Amino acid sequence: MSAVHSRTWYDDTSVSPGWQSSQVIHNENFDFCIIGGGLAGLSCAYHLAEKGASVALLEKSDIGAGASGRNGGFCSTGWAANNLQICRVIGENYSTEFEALGLEGLNWMRQRAFSRRYSKAEAVSGVISLGLSKNTPEDLKVLTKDKLEEFVIGPRYRWGIVDKSAFHFHPLNFLRIFAEETEKIGVKIIENIGLVKTNKTGVISSGGINLRCKRIVWATGGYGLDSNSILKKLVLPIQTFICVTSPMGAILDKYIPTNMALGDERRAGNYFRRLPDGRLLWGMGVSAMQQKPIHKIRSMGFQNIKAHFPDMVHHMEKDRITIDYAWSGLMAYASHFLPVVGQINDREFSLCGFGGHGMNTAPILGKKMANFLTGDSNSLHLFSRIPKQKTYGLLGRLGAEIEYRRLSFIDYLSERY
């Protein structure tokens, strides 16, 4: 599956790249080659170079063209798998260590995102988890309906929990600033290389790149899986959708009077936030099967917002507010919802499968992979416990689609009964 590519709001508000895509001498030698210019690949390359290794980072298109640069811009602790799933896969004794690793990733991101150097990442603290179900958690931090309406006014939202350690930001700007930092430490960033394949000595690309390297890390996420027959069997590309409205600051002041980001607790629920120019970013849905054209994503977005904010949409229609941007992106999911990280063969390693929760997990696992590749054999010990389960291609995608619809039905019942 490939996502329908269209220009995003991030593209139109991004900083200019602060690096020049490198030219590689034919058969140039490197210690490591990283395939994939998202957050995982950049982090791995950065931390390898920090340890003195020579590193080339290859990107099929542009840095941030994949999920890392076109997601909703949410960063929190945790993983795509919930704690029950984590305990079932790796064992209860290791779940606390796994949770700590997710928190370490969040702290790594916060340290950069809120620094002066990363000011264009426009980081804002606070994410509110919204509940639509009638089952309110027994938590002293829960915002009841009346308190919740200080932050969001929508008839279906019953309760909320504020996470002040989480934040939202401009992911493409973050990535471009980090790429500049990565290049300055000595990594050769090579963009627009096309499709790649490996051989006994290194990497060859359809764009004419031919380089030698000792080890290769695949950090392609939901993109580029066709280039690696092993990862293609272990990870499914799952599509999700985002739209952005035209500016409507006054309307948002009434219905979403907070600068914190918001998202509901459903497995494939909605996530949304105000953007600095007065627009609303709205994320929605997943699909393992369908490729939606842009006009359908726009229509779906408007109807989705209306289903949760009918009064707000009435004002939007009155003021002729439109959906100015709509796009899709591919997340990489393994069947157990945990990352596929570790050794593929003697020379190749995988760093993917973050499942829509990669803004904290991808950079910290990029760092751990770099530690592993430079001699710390214990840095990935948790991931040796995660089984490599086949996803079975089309059958797996069909199964994922059925599972999504099953979970959606459960969410529907929990909201009404």
Regions found by a protein language model. Name each.
Residues 70-101:
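Glycine-rich active-site loop/strand segments that organize a redox cofactor
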Residues 115-123, 210-250, 254-346:
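Active-site substrate-recognition segment that forms the wall
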Residues 1-32:
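Extreme N-terminal leader/targeting segments of oxidoreductases
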Residues 165, 288, 292-303, 307-413:
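C-terminal catalytic lobe of FAD-dependent flavoproteins
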Residues 50-70:
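Glycine-rich FAD pyrophosphate-binding loop
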Residues 2-13, 81-87, 110-177:
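Flavin (FAD/FMN) cofactor-binding and adjacent substrate-gating region
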Residues 32-57:
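N-terminal Rossmann-like FAD-binding beta1-loop-alpha1 element of flavoenzymes
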Residues 160-201, 205-214, 219:
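Helical element adjacent to the flavin cofactor pocket in flavoenzyme catalytic cores
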